[in-house]
């Protein structure tokens, strides 16, 4: 990361000069190339991903830290080009926590906690797509809402306990109702390495399925080089057919500071479908001097609840951070 720190007078616009003694501009970036396949009948794909993030942070006379960031994030896989992404502003106070408004690319609490199982690279359900519909649909999962115009609050940790909440109005969700969720994370000070979390929210699944309660709970424990975790999630809709459940577990092992491996499993029970979707995956990553080589090899049985629709997927990526 390259940083430019301004002390005293600034060459920027006069409206920023008053904050220049306490402000910092930073630019960070990354680039990656990858090869992979999303299902058995899929041809090998290649893609390139580039990301540059501009961050401006300053402290007001009242002690608030204000940070605004804009990410230029694009990938090219033969059909898509670059784009702007992740535009946000954060207002933080040591005693009161952080309020974030994401004009683009925001994450709700459920969206960020949809799968927090330990992994060296990708989740066990990731990458795989359904060959039956032309590889346009990925594996079924339970998650919250994310996207544009999203507010989020993250409290400071008090005794290892922190509170989190998110809100997105109906104009942004595109549904009849707004979206909101909240969660609590516990990292008990008396048990080193343990983390427990619970989050719940409500959203509209479609124009006819309204008021779906979504929730997740998880526990992770790190001991030495090993981390293990277990997670359960639920979409509780107005009928049995619109009520879905999932559970997942994972274990990772840090061989050393540079090399990590992991294995995980994920099961999704769709209330409207008979066979459960069952996924498993192995990941590995090796980092040296800002360069990372990552790989994931996943397989899913009954993709999207279709019996005997079994698919394998993989991805190998080379990424650079600067």
Q: Which residues fall in each region the model found?
A:
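Outer-membrane beta-barrel proteins
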Residues: 1-322
């Amino acid at each position: 990361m390259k940083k430019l720190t301004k002390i005293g007078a600034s060459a920027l616009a006069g409206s920023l000069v008053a904050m220049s003694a306490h402000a910092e501009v930073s630019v960070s970036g990354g680039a990656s190339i990858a090869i992979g396949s999303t299902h058995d009948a899929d041809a090998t794909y290649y893609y390139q991903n580039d990301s540059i993030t501009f961050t401006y942070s300053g402290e007001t006379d009242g002690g608030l830290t204000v940070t605004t960031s804009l990410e230029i994030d694009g990938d090219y896989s033969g059909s898509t080009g670059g784009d702007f992404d992740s535009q946000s502003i954060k207002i933080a106070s040591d005693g009161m926590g952080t309020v974030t408004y994401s004009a683009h690319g925001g994450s709700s609490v459920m969206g960020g906690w949809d799968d927090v199982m330990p992994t060296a690279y990708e989740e066990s359900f990731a990458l795989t797509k359904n060959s039956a519909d032309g590889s346009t649909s990925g594996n079924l999962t339970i998650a919250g809402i994310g996207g544009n115009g999203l507010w989020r609050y993250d409290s400071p940790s008090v005794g290892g306990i922190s509170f989190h909440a998110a809100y997105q109005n109906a104009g942004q969700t595109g549904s009849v109702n707004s979206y909101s969720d909240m969660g609590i994370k516990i990292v008990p000070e008396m048990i080193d390495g343990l983390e427990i979390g619970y989050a719940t929210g409500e959203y509209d699944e479609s124009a006819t399925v309204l008021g779906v309660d979504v929730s997740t709970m998880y526990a992770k424990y790190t001991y030495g080089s090993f981390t293990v975790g277990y997670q359960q999630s639920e979409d509780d809709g107005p009928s049995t057919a619109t009520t879905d459940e999932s559970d997942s577990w994972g274990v990772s092992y840090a061989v050393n500071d540079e090399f990590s491996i992991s294995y995980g499993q994920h099961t999704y029970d769709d209330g409207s479908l008979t066979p459960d979707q069952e996924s498993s995956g192995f990941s590995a990553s090796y980092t040296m001097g800002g360069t990372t080589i990552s790989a994931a090899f996943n397989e899913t049985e009954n993709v999207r609840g279709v019996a005997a629709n079994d698919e394998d997927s993989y991805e190998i990526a080379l990424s650079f951070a600067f």
